[in-house]
Amino acid sequence: MKLNYVGIVISRAMPKTAKVRVAKEKFHPVVKKYVTQYQNYMVQDDLNCNVGDAVTIQPCRPRSATKRFEIIKILSTANRMSPASEISKE
């Protein structure tokens, strides 16, 4: 059984590669509160997602020296406006 993670795409600087940030909540025993910890993963992006998209990733065979995950589904897309549409509204 493969573990699936849900995260947000934070970078698309390279072709077919995206950087995804996954948030995990961990209980801190001293302060007795839940603390959010973030882990960034380099993932194989065959679905051509954009920055800000919520995606599901799962482990796969090593694709490169740093890529060990792949995007299997885009859960929601980011609400981004193009610069031309912003200028026309003003």
From Swiss-Prot:
Main location: mitochondrion
Keyword rRNA-binding: yes
CDD domains: Ribosomal_uS17 (cd00364)
Key words, A-Z: Mitochondrion, Ribonucleoprotein, Ribosomal protein, RNA-binding, rRNA-binding
Gene Ontology MF terms: rRNA binding; structural constituent of ribosome
Cellular component GO terms held in the UniProt record: mitochondrial small ribosomal subunit; mitochondrion
Cellular compartments annotated: Mitochondrion
Entries under Pfam families matching the protein: Ribosomal_S17
Entry-linked InterPro entries: NA-bd_OB-fold, Ribosomal_uS17
Keyword Cell inner membrane attached: no
Record's function text: Component of the mitochondrial ribosome (mitoribosome), a dedicated translation machinery responsible for the synthesis of mitochondrial genome-encoded proteins, including at least some of the essential transmembrane subunits of the mitochondrial respiratory chain. The mitoribosomes are attached to the mitochondrial inner membrane and translation products are cotranslationally integrated into the membrane. uS17m may have a meiosis-specific role as it accumulates during the middle stage of sporulation.
Subunit structure: Component of the mitochondrial small ribosomal subunit (mt-SSU). Mature yeast 74S mitochondrial ribosomes consist of a small (37S) and a large (54S) subunit. The 37S small subunit contains a 15S ribosomal RNA (15S mt-rRNA) and at least 32 different proteins. The 54S large subunit contains a 21S rRNA (21S mt-rRNA) and at least 45 different proteins.
Family note: Belongs to the universal ribosomal protein uS17 family.
Protein name (database record): Small ribosomal subunit protein uS17m
Organism: Schizosaccharomyces pombe (strain 972 / ATCC 24843)
Organism classification: Eukaryota, Fungi, Dikarya, Ascomycota, Taphrinomycotina
